[in-house]
A protein has these predicted regions:
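C-terminal catalytic lobe of FAD-dependent flavoproteins
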Residues: 26, 115-116, 125, 137-140, ...
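Short, solvent-exposed loop/turn elements at beta->coil junctions and helix N-caps
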Residues: 12, 51-52, 166-170
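Helix-loop-beta segment of a Rossmann-like dinucleotide-binding subdomain
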Residues: 7-38, 133-134, 194
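Flavin-dependent oxidoreductases
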Residues: 54-124
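Helical element adjacent to the flavin cofactor pocket in flavoenzyme catalytic cores
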Residues: 20-72, 76
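General small-molecule cofactor/ligand-binding pocket signal
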Residues: 8-11, 44-46, 163-165
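Short, glycine-/Ser/Thr-/acidic-enriched flexible segments
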Residues: 29, 52, 75, 79-81, ...
Length: 203
């Protein structure tokens, strides 16, 4: 409330067992596909074009189909690809999480369970998206993560019909704040955006 947010503490509204929740009103359920579908009207997008190398002196981006010259370059490749400038390998780590989509409408709102291996719940069309079971990328552990997520969902929400499942890999900063701005002090007109800590669209 000190930040101007309209919020309240609620009991038994969140779709989690014995949950006390912080409820924030007037939130927007953002559909990224609808947003992206409007972008080509404003500028031209070249898909399936892989950036292989960046010439930071001459502002050239080499791709599999040719070379692109620009006045300014923004490196928004999820994980920064220009090395060794910026020393991002020392500033970032990667985290893997999992999502399943189910046919059933299990929640009317968006919820996030703030605990280790907690769930996120998000309505999508006539069904629901469940996410969670995060771990540091490359450290799988003993049990399959999709199976663990499915077990958690069925334990809390009963029998559900799973339609899709996928994994996401996010870039994390050590202080929890995204990085946006100059790629490195010694590089002119080259910028970076990275480290959204799983809050990409929110940022």
């Amino acid at each position: 409330r000190s930040l101007g947010a309209d919020c309240e503490i609620v009991q038994n509204e969140a779709p989690f067992e014995k949950a006390t929740a912080l409820k924030m009103t007037e939130q927007y359920l953002f559909d990224p596909l609808k947003f992206l579908s409007s972008l080509p009207v404003e500028f031209e997008i070249y898909e399936n074009t892989r950036a292989i190398k960046v010439d930071v002196v001459n502002k050239l981006v080499y791709t599999g189909g040719g070379c692109v010259k620009a006045k300014k370059i923004i490196v928004a490749t999820h994980y920064p690809i220009i090395n060794p400038h910026g020393n991002y390998i020392m500033k970032l780590r990667q985290s893997t999480s999992y999502t399943i989509a189910v046919k059933e409408k299990c929640s009317q709102g968006m919820w996030l369970e703030e605990r280790a291996e907690g769930l996120s719940v998000r309505p999508f069309r006539e069904g629901t998206l469940f996410g969670g079971i995060d771990h540091r990328t490359g450290r799988i552990g003993k049990y399959g993560k999709f199976e663990k997520l499915t077990e958690r969902v069925k334990t809390q929400f009963g029998s559900v019909n799973i339609t899709n499942c996928w994994a996401a890999q996010d870039v994390m900063t050590f202080d929890g704040m995204p990085m946006a701005g100059k790629y490195a002090k010694n590089l002119k007109d080259i910028y970076v955006v990275t480290g959204f800590n799983k809050w990409g669209m929110t940022n």
